[in-house]
Amino acid sequence: MIKKIIFGIAILLSTSCFANSTTSDGSKKDAAKTNDITTQKIIDDFSAYAGTIKPEVREEIQKYRVAIVKINKKKRELYNRLSKEAQNFLAEQQKYKQKLSISKLTVENDQKNNTADSNDNKSKDTK
């Protein structure tokens, strides 16, 4: 179980780190070597940490994950029992929620940028 977790983390880290660590001049070999070292260090650190977890806690976590899988399966079954019209409505509703969250993030970022700009203008005015 722990090996699967470690392997999953390693894959995620290696793909994201590799994408972020490649340089613009194309020195992918150096980036890959650095990435491999970083990934291996993280895996070793996690293995050391996972070794300190009590067996009772591991069992508890495993039961939790099994329960989550059952819940997600039940959710899929419930969704599949809905009429096509209801499924389409939920899909459209999700699109609108995404638009709202993107819109909200844009507004928040604009407000932060405007606040930063106004603070910059104040400091320029006092000079």
Swiss-Prot record:
<keyword id="KW-0449">Lipoprotein</keyword>
<protein>
    <recommendedName>
        <fullName>Uncharacterized lipoprotein RC0077</fullName>
    </recommendedName>
</protein>
<keyword id="KW-0732">Signal</keyword>
<feature type="region of interest" description="Disordered">
    <location>
        <begin position="107"/>
        <end position="127"/>
    </location>
</feature>
<keyword id="KW-0472">Membrane</keyword>
<feature type="coiled-coil region">
    <location>
        <begin position="56"/>
        <end position="101"/>
    </location>
</feature>
<keyword id="KW-0175">Coiled coil</keyword>
<feature type="lipid moiety-binding region" description="S-diacylglycerol cysteine">
    <location>
        <position position="17"/>
    </location>
</feature>
<feature type="compositionally biased region" description="Polar residues">
    <location>
        <begin position="107"/>
        <end position="118"/>
    </location>
</feature>
<keyword id="KW-0564">Palmitate</keyword>
<feature type="lipid moiety-binding region" description="N-palmitoyl cysteine">
    <location>
        <position position="17"/>
    </location>
</feature>
<keyword id="KW-1003">Cell membrane</keyword>
<feature type="signal peptide">
    <location>
        <begin position="1"/>
        <end position="16"/>
    </location>
</feature>
<dbReference type="GO" id="GO:0005886">
    <property type="term" value="C:plasma membrane"/>
</dbReference>
